[in-house]
């Protein structure tokens, strides 16, 4: 299944990481792709770190587990860079997309010497300008789709 793309999302409860993964799954499904989109969280409260996942392929997906070696990682809240190893298992050929006002070079020191591509997007600004309200998952999905 060499056409499989695996994505891991990091966010906090209530920030839309789960919703973003499901929106991306819907969009991929509507283009004829095979998809999976699912969250991983326990009884944590709003604001606790959560993880969500996507698999997208042109072939049927027979894997049914969490994603341990993603092609892409999306970080919805840059404060998680101090709390979670978002680079764990990330392929060197992959990329990280971080919702932040900081530039990628400033953040690389928090990414455990990850040498792959790091992209930043100010999802709040994009969302406010385009939609008049803050929807971090919509602008993060759009940016991710543009680099995948």
Regions found by a protein language model. Give the residues of each.
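Active-site cofactor/cluster-binding pocket
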Residues: 1-148
């Amino acid at each position: 299944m060499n056409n499989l793309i695996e994505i891991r999302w990091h966010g906090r409860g209530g920030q839309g990481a789960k919703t973003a993964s499901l929106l991306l799954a819907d969009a991929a499904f509507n283009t004829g792709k095979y998809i999976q989109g699912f969250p991983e969280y326990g009884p944590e409260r709003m604001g606790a770190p959560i993880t969500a996942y996507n698999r997208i392929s042109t072939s049927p997906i027979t894997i049914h587990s969490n994603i341990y070696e993603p092609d892409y990682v999306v970080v919805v809240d840059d404060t998680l860079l101090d709390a979670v190893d978002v680079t764990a298992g990330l392929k060197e050929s992959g990329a990280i997309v971080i919702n932040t006002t900081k530039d990628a070079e400033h953040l690389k020191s928090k990414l455990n010497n990850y040498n792959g591509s790091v992209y930043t997007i100010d999802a709040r600004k994009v969302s406010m300008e385009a939609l008049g309200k803050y929807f971090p998952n919509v602008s993060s999905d759009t940016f991710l789709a543009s680099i995948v």
